[in-house]
Amino acid sequence: MDEETGGVGKDSRFPSGMTTRKATAKATASAKATANAKISAKAGAPVELTVLQTLHQRIAGCKQCPRLREYGENIGRVKRRAYIDQEYWAKPVPGFGDENARIQIVGLAPGAHGANRTGRPFTGDGAGNFMYPVLHELGLANHGNAVSRDDGLKLKHTWIGSVVRCAPPGDKPTPAEVRNCAAHFAAESAALSKVKVVVALGKIAWDGFLAHMLNAGVIERRSAYTFRHGAEYRLPNGIWLVGSYHPSLRNTNTGRLNKVMFAKVFVRARELAGLR
C-alpha cells in the first residue's frame, strides 16, 4: 500500500511486547549464527551477509499470514496488463536503504502492483515516483527514478520500510496481521542503531509506529502524539517522530500534498538528524 493514504528489552527502540521480543531475539540469534559460520570473502568463498541481509531473507520467506501471502501471489499470477510480461516479486517486502541510516521512513504496506511487483518499497508506483525525486534533490538518494530492484538506486543516510510487509487486500491488513508483522519491524529497526529521526507517511504508519513505542514502554499513551503533516515530537528515548501526508496519488493529484510540502518535511528531518 505504497499508494495508501494514510532491539529488544528496555533499551530497544522498537519492540512490541513479549511476542516481538522473542521473535526479534530469534532473528538476532540467527544473524549471529550466520556471521559466525561464514569465512572471509576471498575468491570462491561465500559473501558475508549483514544482520539486515540475514533478517531480510527471513522476512521474504515469512508465511505467518496465509491470507496476505495468497493475495500477493495471486496478484503476481493475474498481473496488471501493463506488467503482463514482468515477473512479480509476490512475497513479503524487506526494507531498503543505508544500513547506517539516520532517517527511517515508515510506510504502511507494499502496493499490490508496486512493491509487491518490484520487491522494493515505493518502487514502480506513483507514490515512489513522487517521493524518490524529492529524496534525490535533498541528497538522500543517488537518483530519483525508482523502477526496479536493479535500477541502481541507492539511499544515503536513509532507510525505507513499512509496518506490514505483504500487500493486503483492499489496502487493509487485519489487526492480527499487523501484530504478526510487528516482530519484523522491531528486528529491522533495532538493527538500524544510528537512526535519529523517524518519518511516518500517513496516520496509519504514525499510529503503527507509536504502537511499538507504547508496547516498548517508551511512551505512556499514543494520544499525546497527534498526527498532522509536519508534526514533530521528540520521544523520551531521544528519537524524533515527524509526520507527513502519504505521497499517494490520491493526495498528490488533489493537491493535498505537493512537493514543496513534502520537501520541507525532509529538510527538517535532515536537520533533526544532524545532516546539515
Language-model-derived ranges and their functions:
Residues 1-50:
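Intrinsic disorder/low-complexity segments
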Residues 47-276:
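A polyanion-binding, active-site-adjacent surface
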